From Swiss-Prot:
Organism in which the protein naturally occurs: Geotalea uraniireducens (strain Rf4)
GO CC terms in record: cytoplasm
Any Gene Ontology biological process: bacterial-type flagellum assembly
Protein location: Cytoplasm
Claim: Cytoplasm is one of the keywords in the record: yes
Subunit and partners: Interacts with translational regulator CsrA and flagellin(s).
The protein's name in its UniProt record: Flagellar assembly factor FliW
Principal location class: cytoplasm
Keyword annotations of the record: Bacterial flagellum biogenesis, Chaperone, Cytoplasm, Translation regulation
Biased composition (Basic and acidic residues): 136-156
Lineage: Bacteria, Pseudomonadati, Thermodesulfobacteriota, Desulfuromonadia, Geobacterales
DNA-binding keyword on record: no
Family: Belongs to the FliW family.
Listed HAMAP family: FliW
NCBIfam families xref list: PRK13285.2-4 (NF009801)
């Protein structure tokens, strides 16, 4: 299928690579996306709307962005994403780019949870004050040689019991 984008022009995408977000992203009506991973973007990817050439989000895998970032999915969220006990979800964070690398932030309160086997995703809103919508992407400490904070483990998910 052909997908037109304002950033990458016209792309030929396999129908089987389309990610379905039945509830869309908060504030947007689009429900079908593709994940573009250009080599020159390093840890960043583009979540491009299939039906709107102008709508794309820069995203990053949570395991590369925030140490200690954990949360549990509800049983209803696991069902909506068709996650089983053996499923491995991918947790994507929406990135706010900035001219200075030290000013790049990620939204920890609204992660996108993706079931890569079923290509179903959902944006989750984490209640409370534990996480912010503007968490620094790059390490501020000069002790880190890579400059990139790394997760020590992936966010937890709870899976409803089978039966």
């Amino acid at each position: 299928m052909k997908v037109t984008t304002t950033r990458f022009g016209e792309l030929d995408i396999e129908e089987g690579k389309v990610i379905h977000m039945p509830e869309g992203m908060l504030g947007f009506v689009e429900k079908r996306f593709i994940l573009l991973t250009p080599e020159n973007l390093g840890p960043f990817c583009w979540l491009q709307a299939v039906d709107n050439p102008d709508l794309a989000f820069v995203v990053a895998d949570a395991k590369n962005c925030a140490p200690g970032y954990t949360f549990a999915l509800t049983a209803e969220e696991c069902r909506a994403l068709e996650l089983s006990e053996r499923s491995e979800a991918i947790f994507l964070l929406v990135v706010t780019m900035a001219p200075e690398p030290g000013d790049i932030t990620v939204n920890l309160r609204g992660p996108i949870v993706l079931n890569p086997e079923r290509l179903i995703a959902r944006q989750i809103v984490i209640e409370g004050e534990k996480y912010t919508t503007r968490h620094p992407f790059f390490e501020t400490s000069e002790k880190k040689q890579s400059g990139l904070q790394r997760l020590e483990r992936q966010p937890e998910k709870s899976v409803p019991p089978a039966g």
